[in-house]
């Protein structure tokens, strides 16, 4: 069964398993997410649920969004996201999806916006090699060859060059759910997940199962 939830990355810590081994984990506040709309094939051309997550002051939302929440009978939220799930009949408008939809040991895919690094050179952005650092060399961290000379007389598209790094949608696949703390809506994920602390993340069943 497909499952999905929105959450907020709180940070990283470490826990110990029953054998005393240290496991680095990312703590995610997953939900509660409120169902605010059910999309159907007859009306919308596809099936999906629309969920909302995170509190926000009502004055910060415009009238169309306020009306959308009022129609569902739900208080205004910060984030809205659609998920395509298999069994829409089990969910009703106004119902909350909490962290306990997942279980320890499950595998999930987590999506978020990666940390922005600004304008970076090829060494940091693409892990390129440096030039000689010895005395007399004038080539240390420069780009190097960007292509041939008179033919083709241009630099090909997608050539790895300096530019903006980070701040893009990123998905990490097949991460393990180490622990669920349902009373606090917390999910502990083994390893790191994309984005900064307090960043929005999406948690779904892994496609690699």
Curated annotation (Swiss-Prot):
Description of how the protein assembles with itself and partners: Part of the 50S ribosomal subunit. Forms a cluster with proteins L14 and L19.
Family statement: Belongs to the universal ribosomal protein uL3 family.
Record flagged with keyword RNA-binding: yes
Chain intervals for the UniProt region annotation (Disordered): 141-163
Its biological purpose: One of the primary rRNA binding proteins, it binds directly near the 3'-end of the 23S rRNA, where it nucleates assembly of the 50S subunit.
Protein known as: Large ribosomal subunit protein uL3
Organism for this UniProt entry: Clostridium botulinum (strain Kyoto / Type A2)
MF terms (GO), sorted A to Z: rRNA binding; structural constituent of ribosome
